[in-house]
């Protein structure tokens, strides 16, 4: 009975990524970010972060790129995608003060709409564990 209790507890305990999984994810995230995101001419921010999710075996990458063009128009974009397969899970685009896209799609059938950068970042952290 004690063994069954330990087994049940182990199933409910979240697994953490090993150092090798984290490194594999970080390396692939860097590679995919640099290959898929040409640095804009007027980039203010051109960065990414990654998170390896052990339950799904997915390496999530979140990019954040901000630019200011010659007319002082500010653009901010974030994307969350799988570093290995390229599937996009979330996107946010703000041009000037207008949010033109803000969606988080945990599954192909589900699409959560959001309204602000803060909403997007909160949802992305909750759904995928990846943060700025």
Question: What do these predicted ranges mean?
Answer:
Residues 88-132:
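Low-complexity intrinsically disordered segments
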Residues 43-93:
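Mature extracytoplasmic domains of secretory-pathway proteins
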Residues 8-51:
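N-terminal export/targeting and maturation segments
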Residues 19, 23-26, 86, 95, ...:
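Periodic self-assembly scaffolds
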Residues 31, 65-67, 108, 120:
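Secreted/processed peptides and extracellular or luminal domains of membrane proteins
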Residues 24-28, 58-62, 101-103, 113-115:
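Sequence contexts marking disulfide-bonded cysteines in secreted/extracellular proteins
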Residues 21, 55-57, 98, 110:
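Secretory pathway export signals and precursors
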Residues 1-5:
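Bacterial N-terminal signal peptides
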């Amino acid at each position: 009975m004690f063994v069954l209790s330990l087994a049940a507890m182990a199933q409910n305990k979240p697994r953490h990524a090993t150092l090798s999984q984290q490194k594999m994810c970080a390396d692939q995230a860097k590679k995919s970010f640099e290959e898929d995101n040409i640095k804009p001419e007027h980039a203010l921010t051109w960065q990414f972060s990654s998170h390896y999710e052990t339950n799904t075996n997915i390496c999530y990458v979140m990019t954040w790129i901000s630019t200011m063009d010659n007319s002082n128009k500010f653009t901010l974009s974030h994307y969350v995608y799988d570093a290995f397969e390229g599937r996009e899970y979330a996107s946010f685009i703000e041009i000037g003060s207008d949010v033109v896209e803000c969606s988080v799609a945990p599954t192909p059938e589900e699409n959560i709409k959001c309204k602000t950068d803060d909403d997007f970042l909160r949802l992305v952290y909750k759904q995928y564990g990846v943060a700025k």
